[in-house]
From Swiss-Prot:
The keyword Membrane applies. It comes from the Bacteria. GO terms for biological process: succinate transport. Its main location: membrane. This is Probable succinate transporter subunit YjjB. Signal peptide: none annotated. Involved in succinate export with YjjP. Both proteins are required for export. Keywords: Cell inner membrane, Cell membrane, Membrane, Transmembrane, Transmembrane helix, Transport. It is found in: Cell inner membrane. It is a multi-pass membrane protein. Belongs to the ThrE exporter (TC 2.A.79) family. It comes from Yersinia pseudotuberculosis serotype I (strain IP32953). InterPro entries: ThrE_2, ThrE_Dicarb/AminoAcid_Exp, YjjB.
Length: 156
């Protein structure tokens, strides 16, 4: 790992902590838990960035990062006596696919304004599916640790 990758990782983590902290404040998270929301958002986004850097596609990296956010959030909730969603929901929001969704919607507007074009339709479908799979991976990954760690009966 070079210095440029470490610098990019640090920058990515700091810039991901800011919206995680902002959404935690919007969701009325207790003041004592705000720093943990920001840290968890930075950890999740930074780990996703590293997975993407080392060749994993963004959908799978988002799934793994959101599972990691869920597991860490459950552990911190036991330590800080709070519900896991206090930490996890605000931490996962910086990973939502805003650019893909925006590009898909712009393609829809251009198709309605300019008429059908195969290139615009391809851009729309590609970005819409990419955004949908990322959102699905985030929601599934955030819910799986709760299903695994709070299970009362044995798995078999």
């Amino acid at each position: 790992m070079g210095v440029s990758l470490l610098w990019a990782l640090l920058q990515d983590m700091v810039l991901a902590a800011i919206p995680a902290l902002g959404f935690a404040m919007v969701f009325n998270v207790p003041v004592r838990a705000l720093r943990y929301c920001a840290l968890l958002g930075a950890i999740g986004h930074g780990s996703r960035m590293l997975m993407i850097h080392f060749g994993m596609n963004i959908e799978l990296a988002s799934l793994v990062a959101s599972i990691m956010i869920g597991v860490i959030g459950i552990n911190w909730s036991r330590w800080l006596l709070a519900h896991p969603k206090v930490f996890t929901v605000a931490a996962v929001i910086p990973m939502f696919p805003g650019i893909s969704a925006y590009t898909a919607m712009i393609s829809v507007v251009e198709i309605s304004h300019l008429g059908y074009s195969e290139a615009l339709m391809s851009t729309m479908v590609t970005n819409f599916l990419k955004a949908s799979f990322i959102v699905g991976a985030l929601s599934i990954g955030l819910s799986l640790p709760g299903l695994w760690l709070y299970r009362k009966r044995p798995g078999v």
